[in-house]
Amino acid sequence: MAEDKFEQAKGNIKETVGNATDNKELEKDGKGDKASGKAKEAVENVKEKANDVIDKFKGNKGD
């Protein structure tokens, strides 16, 4: 998950520098990095929630 946050931060820096220097390519790359980091983070969150549900199901299975 830390990698996802790092990718988002890296994207934010690229986007900001690209915007400040009027470098549209760098700005676009930054936006892509941010989106990719957010998507990966969302997938990880879904995996964690699914595993929580599975663990609860397994724990209650013998009741």
From Swiss-Prot:
Domain of life: Bacteria
Positions of the UniProt region annotated as Disordered: 1-46
Alphabetized SUPFAM superfamilies for the sequence: Hypothetical protein YjbJ
Basic and acidic residues composition bias: residue spans: 22-46
Entry-linked Pfam families: CsbD (PF05532)
Family as reported in the entry's similarity comment: Belongs to the UPF0337 (CsbD) family.
Name this polypeptide is given: UPF0337 protein SERP0494
Organism: Staphylococcus epidermidis (strain ATCC 35984 / DSM 28319 / BCRC 17069 / CCUG 31568 / BM 3577 / RP62A)
